[in-house]
Amino acid sequence: SRRERTIYTPEQLEAMEEVFGVNRYPDVSMREELASRLGINESKIQVWFKNRRAKLRNLE
């Protein structure tokens, strides 16, 4: 009964990567704006940024 893995479209990934390039820690209003623009839950966006920062640390 685990939840399904979220699969993001290339457009969604591009938009999130673009924000990440400017700000690795977007605040809730920025995440909400992204969420409504991309049609994703804000919580999913929060998790994506958390994981993206972890990925960045692993690459360093």
UniProtKB/Swiss-Prot annotation:
Known DNA-binding region: 1-60
Key words of the record: Developmental protein, DNA-binding, Homeobox, Nucleus
GO molecular function: DNA-binding transcription factor activity, RNA polymerase II-specific; RNA polymerase II cis-regulatory region sequence-specific DNA binding
Cross-referenced SMART domains: HOX (SM00389)
Pfam families in UniProt: Homeodomain
Gene3D superfamilies named in the record: Homeodomain-like
Superkingdom classification of source: Eukaryota
Keyword DNA-binding attached: yes
Subcellular location: Nucleus
GO cellular component: a single term: nucleus
Family: Belongs to the paired homeobox family. Bicoid subfamily.
Name of the protein in its database record: Homeobox protein EgHBX4
Organism: Echinococcus granulosus (Hydatid tapeworm)
Taxon lineage: Eukaryota, Metazoa, Spiralia, Lophotrochozoa, Platyhelminthes
